[in-house]
Amino acid sequence: MNEVKFLSVKLAEKLDLSAIASVFNVTRTVKWQEVLLIDHELVELVLKRPVEKREVYLYSFGVATFVDFTEAEIRDFLAFIAQIQTVNYDDFAMYYDHYEAVVGDYGEWIVTPTLTIPFRPMIKHIAEAVAKSTGFMHTEAHLNRVMDSVEPMITKLAAGRSRITKTTMRIVRETIVFKFKLTRNLKLFERPSDAEFDNISREGYDWLSNHFELDERYQINAQKIETLKRMVYQYYHFNQNRKVRSLYIFEVFLLMLFPLVRMLSDRLPLMLAWLLRS
């Protein structure tokens, strides 16, 4: 019996899987697939030493899952990836998750004392579950920060206690961009279709999903994104109302100005005559 360690880390906002695949000379049969497997033979080429059962799963949403790597091996692999695209080491240090799979002498994953599943077919599913947990961690933190910035601004606008400044516009612009990124990435975190599993592997993935609370976190993030959308709509609503109100005030000003202009125009000849006599 032994433990196989899965470590997922956030490397970038988005990983360019096509660029990485071309460096490794890996043919991606389906370009839109959101995961790229670097098997142990390719890992050996990067680390320049023999390694057993090391694999890396790279996901387009910027997360990598290392299977049974040591810390030194992870550092060496990241140094190689950094030559292909920028690695955000700040995110790497902040957003990560892990899981240790207990594997029996006959190659079975001992999920619980009453549930065992063949380990090898489940590796990709375990890697995906840990990667999604890490991705959620990053999304949750950024989503909370954005909402903390936007909510007070919307409240002040609603109360008429805030002007639409360059800072306000910048926050809203960043919020809109972030909202679209979240909406796109959240689709990648959706539950896999039943076609990807047989009955046994489905049971294993269900256990992983419960362990990392993936379904609950997906729903919470989806609800927060909807709240963020409503906040942006409120901003446009208040902004539009403010423009309409400004036009109304200007219209009232013009209506008040017309009688004055007419009065002055009627008396203008008399005023000119008086000035000339003076």
Segments from the language model and where they lie:
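Membrane-associated alpha-helical segments
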Residues: 159-258, 262, 266-272
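Short Lys/Arg-enriched alpha/beta "domain-start" segment
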Residues: 1-121, 125
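Membrane-interfacial helical/loop segments at transmembrane boundaries in membrane proteins
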Residues: 272-278
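Hydrophobic side chains in well-ordered alpha-helices
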Residues: 20, 76-80, 135, 139-142, ...
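Membrane-proximal low-complexity regions enriched in glycine and acidic/polar residues
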Residues: 116-184
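Short secondary-structure junctions and interdomain/linker hinges
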Residues: 27, 84-88, 146, 150-153, ...
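Generic structural signal of hydrophobic/aromatic residues within well-ordered alpha-helices
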Residues: 20, 24, 77, 81, ...
